[in-house]
């Protein structure tokens, strides 16, 4: 599958290139040239799959330049090893008849951002390896809350990556500060800055 830029439809890159670059050189976002179509039978077949199996199936439609082994590394690394407090990863909980909620807080930091940030580092390392070789990827993050801890936890000890999170010293809760400053991992760092979130971004 090819990806194009929201600012220039003549751009055409692989999914690995889009992930490794983050944004297009023209400042646009990468989007799929076309959205894969699933039949009702395809959707029904996924209903009984585990979250991990379903994720591999859906990602294979969008990341066509990834091998099954690479997809397994990304998905199983993100959602395996009891990282989530439910084996369903994102279970649906019935409140009462006809009312259900999707629980997106079952990840290691109890933030919905765990859903993406547990997989992103693995997608990035595979994508960088496929496009530019074995370079180390350094991620700089600015946060005013949950993103920092979720990003640190996601990138923790993922080979080929380092992450540095900036946060406003007076702009996060005491709990969030403790979560970030006590983060384990050999490739993670945090830095408090004087100022607000906008200052952290610059």
Describe the role of every protein-language-model region.
Residues 1-202:
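PLP-dependent amino-acid enzyme catalytic core
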């Amino acid at each position: 599958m090819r990806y194009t830029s929201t600012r220039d439809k003549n751009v055409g890159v692989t999914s690995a290139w889009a992930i490794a670059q983050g944004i297009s050189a023209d400042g646009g976002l990468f989007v799929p040239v076309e959205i894969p179509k699933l039949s009702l039978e395809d959707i029904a077949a996924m209903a009984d799959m585990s979250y991990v199996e379903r994720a591999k199936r859906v990602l294979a439609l969008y990341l066509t330049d990834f091998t099954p082994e690479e997809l397994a590394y990304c998905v199983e690394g993100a959602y395996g090893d009891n990282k989530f407090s439910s084996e369903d990863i994102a279970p649906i909980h019935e409140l009462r008849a006809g009312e259900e909620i999707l629980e997106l807080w079952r990840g290691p930091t109890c933030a919905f951002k765990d859903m993406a940030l547990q997989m992103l580092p693995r997608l990035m390392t595979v994508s960088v390896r496929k496009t530019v070789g074995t370079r180390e990827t350094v991620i700089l993050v600015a946060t005013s809350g949950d993103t920092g801890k979720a990003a640190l936890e996601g990138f923790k000890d993922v080979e080929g990556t380092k992450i540095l999170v900036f946060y406003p010293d007076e702009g996060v809760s005491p709990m969030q500060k403790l979560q970030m400053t006590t983060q384990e991992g050999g490739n993670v760092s945090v830095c408090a800055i004087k100022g607000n979130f906008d200052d952290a971004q610059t």
